[in-house]
Each structure stands twice: as C-alpha cells, then as structure tokens.
Design a protein with these regions (language model features):
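Short, structured segments at the rim of ligand-binding sites
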Residues: 1-424
Length: 424
C-alpha cells in the first residue's frame, strides 16, 4: 500500500492521546492468562502484536473475550493440548515471552511467524535449552521447543534483548524451586525488566534484585487474576513529541508521570535538545523552540532510535546516538533503513556499528521523486511521517500498513496535528 503524507492546510498543532503501552499490554495479557480466574484488562489497542499475544494466550491456557478497547482473560489453570503451531505474526515480544512459558506445557510447542521474526536471534534461549538437554529447533519455517526448564541458576548476557530476561521472569516463578538470574554486565534495558516485574507484582508474582546484576525468583508462586489498566505508551508518544518539539502547538495526553517505561527518556532527550514543554498531570504540551544536537545513549530505550534520527536532521549541529546496535535486529535493520530513506530526502548522516551521527540539515531536506520505503517496519513508517509533517515535505511512503503492528490508528490520530494522509 502506498500512502501520501502531506501537511494539512491548518499547519501543525492539536491534541493527541498516547495509545496504550504495547509493552505493558503484552505483559498484562500473559500474566492474566497464567492466572486462575478472570482478569479484566482495560485501555488496549488491538495492534497486530497485541492480537498475536491474545491469540496465543487463548491457544495455550486462557479464554479471551475482547471488547472495543478491553479484554476479559479467563485463566484456565492448565495448558490446552495444541493442535496447531502458535502464530506470533511479527511480534518478537510474543515469541520471546512465550518460549519459556511453553516449557511448562508438557508438550512440544512450535512457533511460527512472519517477516523477519524467525530470522531474529534466539541464541540466548538456545544456549539455555541445550545446557538442560531440552529440544530447541529453529529454522526459517518455525521454532520448536520441548521439555521442562528446571529451577536453579541462569547466567545470560545483560546487553542482549531484555525480552529473554522477561520470558524467564514469567515462567521460572511457577517452578517448584527458587531460581536466580545472573546477568552479565552491562545490563541494558533494565527499565523493561522492571516493567515486567511490576506487572507481575500486580498479578501476585514477585521477584527482587539481590544486587545490580542478580535477580531472585522465588519458586512455587501463582498468578492471581486482577483488573489492570494499561498506561499510555511513551515509545509511541515519541513521534508526536518530536513533531511538537520542532513545530510547537502539540499536546499529548495519557502519559503517566510516575511511569517505569524506559522510553519516557524521550522527554529528557528533548529537554536537552532545547525543547520547550510543560507537563500538567498526564498531559505534555510543546511550544516551538530552537533545537540543538546532543549525545544520546540508546541502551535503555532502543525503540526511540528511528524518530531520534529524524530529530537530529531538524536540530542545529550534530546529534550522536550511541549503543544502537540492537536497531539492526528489529523488524528491519533500522539503522540502514533510516539512513537510506533520510539520505533520499537530503539528510546527512552516517553510522559505525552501533553509533549513528546525524548532522542538522533542515534547510537542504526535500521530497524525492520516488516513493520512500517503509521497510515493513512500523517505527520507520511513523518516523518518516514525522519528517513529512515537521519539515513540510509531501512524501510518499510504501509499506505504510506496517503501522498495524503497533499503532493501527496512528494516521487517524495524527490528523488533528496536521498530518493529512491519502492512499496513493
């Protein structure tokens, strides 16, 4: 699908509600499914990723009833016999969270996916499974695991995706003995680990840090049903936040001030760039201000990478984004994808491994004659949409349907901010 993104006649400005946090929703759905009894999860958006997790929960151990923006999840207290593979679509969270849970089912479980999902590395789990002589088979067609994980000590790198750590956090407390996770420094994305722990605690399962790199997971625990309201998503709010910082006149609602989301770092990053904004409760309002480049550490907030590359083009001076290696292993190689599309618009930037250097060049940006490529990546498409609006460029972007993965209503929600969308 081709989508043309243009500035609306009224220019930039308006109010937008942050969509529900996809990260928190994944976690709440799985905790509810593992509980015995009915949980009610409110403030949901049924993106492809969340729909994949809900579908997997229903296939494994729960009855799921969805409403307009909520879901009732009835944990059955036992695992269902599987008659088909578990389809994770393109959701890395769904797959990596469920692999350890699958070890509790007492049966072989095959996962399938689409896009680049089955190409994404799972070596952390593969090593753990092979150490315990469990079945772990991965190919481009799917991934099959079989056998029960045992309680005990687990050592894994702290600088790989926190999704592996969260997956073990979900499953190990249900085993009969205590377990410890020993994370080899540096520990990145700690905020996502603590988000998992906080959601688990709401459902009655607890863990604690023994020191900066060791987690204790007491065994013999049980998830309990509860009513859970999902926060607004800071990683998605980053798109209108960058637009507001550049152009002013944008208010974002639904952003909890006391959040555990690591992507709340977007506000600190924008403040360091010179952005002018005020917070009132869960709302943040931006005024236009001159922006300058800064040095950004992406270790705890990798999802911000693509839109921060757009921000760098629109700041004065140079922006350096460090510890961005994991961007190469997402739905696309996000560094290469954004470099290619931003250069097509006149952007000046380069990368070396996990370091991206972006040179402010707003005055030389232009709309290329050929369509830009969305690389089947929701964050690439939304970042290019911000560029179109903030730099007043009438861009054409393909693969725009990729937004269905995380924020299906993005274009409609962004319309009041001055982003006009037409099918091309």
């Amino acid at each position: 699908m081709l989508v043309t993104i243009r500035l609306a006649p009224g220019g930039i400005g308006g109010v937008i509600a942050a969509p529900p946090s996809k990260s928190m929703a994944h976690r709440a759905v799985l905790c509810a499914a593992l509980a015995v009894g009915r949980s009610h999860i409110t403030h949901l958006e049924f993106s492809k990723d969340i729909s994949a997790t809900l579908s997997a929960a229903a296939q494994l151990c729960a009855a799921v009833d969805t409403g307009a923006d909520d879901a009732a999840v009835q944990g059955l207290g036992h695992f269902l016999p599987l008659t088909a593979p578990v389809d994770c679509c393109e959701s890395g969270s769904t797959l990596r969270f469920l692999i350890p849970i699958a070890s509790l089912t007492g049966q072989p479980v095959t996962f399938t996916g689409r896009g680049r999902l089955m190409e994404r590395p799972q070596s952390v789990y593969e090593t753990l499974y092979r150490e315990q002589n469990l079945r772990f088979e991965q190919s481009s067609a799917g991934l099959t695991v079989e056998g029960a994980l045992t309680p005990g000590d687990y050592r894994l790198a702290g600088n790989v995706s926190s999704q592996f750590i969260s997956g073990l956090l979900f499953a190990l407390p249900l085993l009969p003995g205590d377990s410890q996770l020993h994370l080899i420094p540096p520990v990145e994305s700690r905020s996502y680990i603590d988000m998992t722990r906080a959601v688990q605690a709401a459902f009655g399962v607890h863990s604690r840090w023994l020191d900066a790199t060791t987690l204790l997971l007491p065994g013999g625990q049980q998830y309990h049903p509860c009513d859970y309201n999902v926060e607004g998503d800071y990683s998605q709010a980053a798109f209108p936040a960058v637009l507001g910082a550049v152009c002013g006149g944008v208010t974002i609602t639904g952003l909890a001030p006391d959040t555990l989301q690591g992507d709340a770092a977007i506000l600190d990053i924008l403040r360091r760039c010179g952005a002018a904004f005020t917070r009132k409760g869960d709302s943040v309002t931006f005024a236009k201000a001159p922006l300058h480049g800064v040095d950004i550490d992406l270790a705890d907030c990798p999802d911000l990478g693509p839109v921060l590359m757009v921000l760098g083009l629109l700041c004065e001076g140079t922006t350096v984004i460090r510890n961005a290696e994991r961007l190469r292993l997402k739905e696309s190689d996000r560094i290469a994808a954004m470099e290619a599309e931003l250069r097509a618009c006149g952007g000046v930037l380069e990368s070396d491994g996990g370091t991206i250097t972006v040179h402010g060049c707003a005055e030389r940006l232009h709309a290329p004659a050929a369509p830009l490529h969305g690389h089947n990546d929701h964050r690439v498409v939304m970042s290019l949409s911000v560029l179109a609006a903030a730099a007043a460029l009438p861009l054409t972007v393909d693969d725009a349907e990729a937004i269905q993965k995380s924020w299906p209503g993005f274009f409609a929600d962004a319309a009041p901010l001055g982003v006009e969308v037409e099918d091309a």
